[in-house]
């Protein structure tokens, strides 16, 4: 059994920055300005002129939050570079490329438009450590050190941010790579990649059909994108496309659709890209980093290729930490977060998509034959809500868990973890016998309900 504890309680930062419903709780202009002031003070070190890169997705509230962040950063003496709508990995890239002290992405990823979030990146383009976020939290609740009028920062928009990122995307595949033979449906979720992803794929030669490229401030992730696949599945089949590419609101995750309209998740994509990298002696670390939620089938497949699967707790930040400490250059999540460290410092759905398209072209085979690299082991996840207490500490629940492990008899996996944001226990089991998997999950869920 793999069981996670709850994260250390923090007032502002969660597992992926600060996130919430706009104009409530921590997601207000006032809090955004204080975050900017605290982060600006923290990163305002050295004698050089300090700067921050700010990008956003297409949410209506993005303009409001951007203005608050600009006010906060400039008030503590930092210059601001505004990119406009741009994917999260592009903001991370430009932060490093433009020698900025800090990068900020305004996005709530795959959440509906009512939510928004603030993600921070250090000068190296990587997300901040827990220690740095805690230091910034302390600054948020302290009095800001406002600078004299003559030292207030300046703000400017750069017009070529999209072009810079498109160039970097094309550099992530070989110079000989062309997609002339492919007809590709690209779904950008009416989000941050609505201009850059179709352009990059088209510039590499593909015929493209676009979905989710008409953002209006309120339609991000609404019936389109990697969490709403009906439209792209239907379009791929109706248009006779070779493949579909579905991104989420900030384009840090990817789900692929084969020519038959079947979805291909992050586990299959990781398996495909990792084996192609291994064939070219480009894979580092001897395998792939994924979370405890990745399918056992991926682990068995990699093992058959003499590669290993290193597991972490859920969250792409934990995947990235293990990649950095273990020398890996590919990792991700079943949900579609894909980190290719040779080309990006955070999850980048478009970079991963280009790798998938290159593999498809080089194979000369249909996507349905190329993308489904392993047989999935039956897997079931259920969420159980509870009221008060700690149900996982109850003897009755521990007995149910022990019975489940005994029933699986080493031929499956059991993952039980509390949610870090709500009173929910997540129960996942997988094994070769689908009926047995369902039985053990239901038994544990019943025990949690009774204990709660």
UniProtKB/Swiss-Prot annotation:
A Gene Ontology term for the protein's cellular component: cytosol
EC number(s) from the headed UniProt entry: 5.4.2.10
Residues that coordinate or bind Mg(2+): 109, 248, 250, 252
Residues modified to Phosphoserine: 109
PTM per Swiss-Prot/TrEMBL: Activated by phosphorylation.
Catalytic reactions of this protein: alpha-D-glucosamine 1-phosphate = D-glucosamine 6-phosphate
Active-site residues, record numbering mapped to chain: 109
Pfam family, one: PGM_PMM_IV
Keyword Metal-binding carried by entry: yes
Cofactor note: Binds 1 Mg(2+) ion per subunit.
Record flagged with keyword Isomerase: yes
Any one GO BP annotation for this protein: UDP-N-acetylglucosamine biosynthetic process
NCBIfam families, alphabetized: glmM, PRK10887.1
Name recorded for this polypeptide: Phosphoglucosamine mutase
Protein's organism: Erythrobacter litoralis (strain HTCC2594)
């Amino acid at each position: 059994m793999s069981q996670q504890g709850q994260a250390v309680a923090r007032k502002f930062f969660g597992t992926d920055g600060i996130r919430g419903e706009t104009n409530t709780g921590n997601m207000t202009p006032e809090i955004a300005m204080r975050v900017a002031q605290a982060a600006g003070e923290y990163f305002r070190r050295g004698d050089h002129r300090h700067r921050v890169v700010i990008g956003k997705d297409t949410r209506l509230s993005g303009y409001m939050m951007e203005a608050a962040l600009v006010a906060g950063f400039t008030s503590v003496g930092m210059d601001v570079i505004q990119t406009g709508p741009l994917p999260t990995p592009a903001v991370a890239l430009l932060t490093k490329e433009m020698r900025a002290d800090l990068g900020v992405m305004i996005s709530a990823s795959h959440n509906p438009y009512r939510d928004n979030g603030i993600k921070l990146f250090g000068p190296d383009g990587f997300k901040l450590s827990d220690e740095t976020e805690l230091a910034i939290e302390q600054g948020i609740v302290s009095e800001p050190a406002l600078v004299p009028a003559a030292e207030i920062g300046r703000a400017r928009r750069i017009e070529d941010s999209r072009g810079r990122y498109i160039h970097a995307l094309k550099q992530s595949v070989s110079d000989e790579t062309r997609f002339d033979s492919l007809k590709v449906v690209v779904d950008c979720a009416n989000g941050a990649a609505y201009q850059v992803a179709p352009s990059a794929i088209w510039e590499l030669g593909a015929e493209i059909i676009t979905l989710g490229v008409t953002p209006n401030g309120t339609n991000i992730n609404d019936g389109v994108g990697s969490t709403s696949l009906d439209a792209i599945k239907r379009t791929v089949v109706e248009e006779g496309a070779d493949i579909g590419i579905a991104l989420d609101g900030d384009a840090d995750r990817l789900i692929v659709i084969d020519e038959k309209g079947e979805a291909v998740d992050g586990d299959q994509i990781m398996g495909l890209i990792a084996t192609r990298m291994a064939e070219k002696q480009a894979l580092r670390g001897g395998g792939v980093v994924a979370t405890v939620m990745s399918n056992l089938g991926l682990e068995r497949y990699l093992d058959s290729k003499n590669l290993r699967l290193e597991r972490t707790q859920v969250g792409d930040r934990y995947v990235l930490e293990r990649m950095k400490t273990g020398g890996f250059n590919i990792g991700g999540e079943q949900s579609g977060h894909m980190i290719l460290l040779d080309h990006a410092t955070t999850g980048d759905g478009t970079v991963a998509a280009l790798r998938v398209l290159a593999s498809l072209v080089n194979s000369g085979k249909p996507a349905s034959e190329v993308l489904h690299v392993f047989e999935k082991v039956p897997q079931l996840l259920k969420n159980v809500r509870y009221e008060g207490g700690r149900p996982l500490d109850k003897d009755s629940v521990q007995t149910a868990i022990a019975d489940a492990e005994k029933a699986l008899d080493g031929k499956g996996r059991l993952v039980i973890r509390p949610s870090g944001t709500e009173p929910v226990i997540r129960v996942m089991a997988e094994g070769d016998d689908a009926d047995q998997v369902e039985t053990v999950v239901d038994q544990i869920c019943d025990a949690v309900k009774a204990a709660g």
